[in-house]
Amino acid sequence: MTVLSEKKCIPCEGGVPPLEKKEIDKLLAELQNEWQVNELGHLYKKYKFPNFVKALDFANKIAAIAEQEVHHPNLNISWGVCNVEIWTHKINGLTENDFILAAKIESKI
C-alpha cells in the first residue's frame, strides 16, 4: 500500500463522484490527528502558532506544496492561526487528492 504522502495528485476534470463515507473514513484514518470533515463535507484542520508571522510562513509553505500538486486548499490566516480547508472544487466533494494534499502538508511541514 502506498503512503498518501508519496502519491501525486491527479487533476480532476469533473464528472467523477465524490468519495463515499466509508472511503472517507478509511483515508481520514491515514492522516495525522486533528484532520476532520467539516459540516460542508470539506477536509479541515486548524493549526495554531505563537504569532501572525509564523501562521503566514506556514501558509506560504502550504502554497508551495499546493503549486507542486496543482491542488489548492482554502487558507484562512489570522493572528496565530491558519485554518486549512481542502476539497475538490470541480465536484464540490472529497477525492483522494484532498487526502494526498493533507498528507503532504503533514509530512513536509
Curated annotation (Swiss-Prot):
EC number: 4.2.1.96
Catalytically driven reaction(s): (4aS,6R)-4a-hydroxy-L-erythro-5,6,7,8-tetrahydrobiopterin = (6R)-L-erythro-6,7-dihydrobiopterin + H2O
Enzyme class per UniProt: lyase
Descriptive protein name: Putative pterin-4-alpha-carbinolamine dehydratase
Disulfide bonds, paired cysteine numbers: none
GO biological process: tetrahydrobiopterin biosynthetic process
Family from the record: Belongs to the pterin-4-alpha-carbinolamine dehydratase family.
One example GO MF annotation: 4-alpha-hydroxytetrahydrobiopterin dehydratase activity
Keywords: Lyase
